[in-house]
Amino acid sequence: ILVANRGEIAVRLLEEAPSPALTPELRITAYLPSGGPFVR
């Protein structure tokens, strides 16, 4: 589970359209314009 400034939205987007080529950390930054803080 990823938690970020927009955690719930980002995680839902990742679950709906996962990108196997990228790690979860890289994928979540795509949904956070600031590339903001997150924890795994």
From Swiss-Prot:
Cofactor binding note: Binds 2 magnesium or manganese ions per subunit.
Any one Gene Ontology molecular-function term assigned to this protein's record: acetyl-CoA carboxylase activity
ATP-grasp domain segment(s): 13-27
Annotated transmembrane regions: none
Residue ranges occupied by any Biotin carboxylation domain in the UniProt entry: 1-40
Keyword Manganese: yes
Catalytic activities: N(6)-biotinyl-L-lysyl-[protein] + hydrogencarbonate + ATP = N(6)-carboxybiotinyl-L-lysyl-[protein] + ADP + phosphate + H(+)
Keyword list, A-Z: ATP-binding, Biotin, Fatty acid biosynthesis, Fatty acid metabolism, Ligase, Lipid biosynthesis, Lipid metabolism, Magnesium, Manganese, Nucleotide-binding
GO biological process, one term: malonyl-CoA biosynthetic process
Functional pathway: Lipid metabolism; malonyl-CoA biosynthesis; malonyl-CoA from acetyl-CoA: step 1/1
Assembly behavior: Acetyl-CoA carboxylase is a heterohexamer of biotin carboxyl carrier protein, biotin carboxylase and the two subunits of carboxyl transferase in a 2:2 complex.
Described function: This protein is a component of the acetyl coenzyme A carboxylase complex; first, biotin carboxylase catalyzes the carboxylation of the carrier protein and then the transcarboxylase transfers the carboxyl group to form malonyl-CoA.
Name by which UniProt lists this protein: Biotin carboxylase
Organism of this sequence: Populus euphratica
Upper classification of the organism: Eukaryota, Viridiplantae, Streptophyta, Embryophyta, Tracheophyta
